[in-house]
Amino acid sequence: KVDGEYKRFAFTEDGISPRSRLGLDNGVFWNTGDESDEFGHITEDPQVRIQMMDKRMSRLDLVTKRVPDDEQVVSFGVHDYTIISWGSTKGPILDAISILKKEGINIGFIQIKLIHPFPSDYVKSLLKNAKTIIDIEANHSGQLGKIFKQNVLREIDYFILKYTGRGMTSTEIYDSLKKIVENNANKREVLSHGA
């Protein structure tokens, strides 16, 4: 039971407001797409807007403090050649680097799981000995590569991208990585395998 009026968006020390559970007495609140006060009522008051935005942004610091490094970024080893990626590319990347390892070619891989706030210091520490950074993504523009460059202040050496709407395969990643290791690759490799 909530005593008094429930403030769904109450200002708190850590920036996280208490949540109501279904059926909680006096736990009714409003959600809007516009700025709201602590009760969820729409407001255009500039001071409330400033307080609410400051509250939201304070959570970014909280995330950095509370989420362990190994949950922000997963390292599958770092070598001279190291891949950065995110999302659905993980499986085919691990398969491709496993095949390459059997051929005596070691390629590292770090999977970025937290994009904002970007774990810059941790990523920098992981990649300090990597000589070549390869960005593998399922989009046209290499979005993670841009975020990486902005936060880590380091260039991506090679992009392997696929944006056909089909998933990447370990075979096409393997082929692209092999070209990079053999110094026979374009800076931007666009994949198109798949029916």
State each model region's role.
Residues 1-195:
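Flexible, low-complexity linker and terminal segments
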